[in-house]
């Protein structure tokens, strides 16, 4: 091959890759992009409140404001992520969320255009919820409950509602009140310290009434909800439960009666002696408030009890409670908090409690498949008392108390299944039908849920459930009989 021909072939080979590469090269021209951290911004109710919007762009962008009642800064930015701060210039004094306007963001060089709506929460909350957790013996579990609420709080929960917590982290003589809320700037749950009560006694009705009254001043709302998480013994007077306030010794062997079995798992029944409040005192404290709680959730043992609920019927509209002991874990707050903002969802709260202990109990601390729950409609309690009064006027049928379903491991038993008790005590079919109708109205069947058994610290074992109406009664018991006959329920149904 001659040298000129070789040079021509070599040149051709060098040119071919260059042409091939030019034909297959990628178009590296970047497409304009504009993304936002939110499609809607909701400002707090007060003037001066702020929220943040993150703008991420591939190049220069601008912002235009439409509406009034808020400002935004900066109004433009460049490549990368820029934080825009929105500031409310006025307070929204209404009871409803207000639409303030919108932000229009665009890229001048024919890029994307996006719109963000801007709203402001009302000064009067849709609902104020208080989680009241007095006492120290369950403090570590209370901390877990509070963390559960933090996990539940997001941009949608509690929405236009507000959540407050009062507990006693330091000692039994002081209390801390704080608010948990969604902070749009950090996109997470934040805490606002409200007040330290330097002198607080959870067993003093005046202290408790003051706390509840000041809550409405701090967070006025269209409706109110209350969760009480502590130890519970239903209607049993403090003097017959553990140590009465001011007493040196428990009465009538009460301390031994309420003694948990050796090695028992903790439940929300025993502890915090000397700081108990009678249910009648709680009812009076609630009734004296300038507002009424729409619901009261007892994260306590034994509170789904007719003697107890009768005392509360004029103080609250709905009650969620358990007829037996609640494991120390308590309610699954990360699951129930999103359900607590409309009365229609109270049944869902019951379901979430039951579902935890029925299906997810392995995730709880003590892994006990023990969870019973009931929803009470308090406006129906008087009607139930009326039919019970007429039942008690009829001759009592003979029955064996030992065959009745009980809900604790105490000896002698104290809490009996009310539905089963009435069915064996009354032989009048018409009255039984009327009782069943009133009972279902007061305690909707779909919200009376139970596991196959319940755990009791008083005998340190699981106990089977063969009858479940969801409500207990203490009348068949031989313990605290004089105290029981002094209850408002007994007097109202035994004329």
Specify the residue positions occupied by each region the protein language model found.
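Bacterial Sec-dependent N-terminal signal peptides
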Residues: 16-42, 71, 106-124
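N-terminal extension/subdomain marker
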Residues: 122-221
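Surface-exposed loop and adjacent secondary-structure segments within mature catalytic domains
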Residues: 168-193, 227-273
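A short beta-strand micro-motif common to beta-rich folds, especially ectodomain repeats
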Residues: 84, 94-109
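Solvent-exposed loop/turn segments at secondary-structure junctions
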Residues: 135-138, 169-173, 200, 230-236, ...
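Terminal, contiguous helix-loop blocks that mediate binding/assembly
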Residues: 250-495
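Sec-dependent bacterial lipoprotein signal peptides
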Residues: 1-22
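Surface-exposed binding patches on compact interaction domains or structured appendages
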Residues: 33-36, 56-83
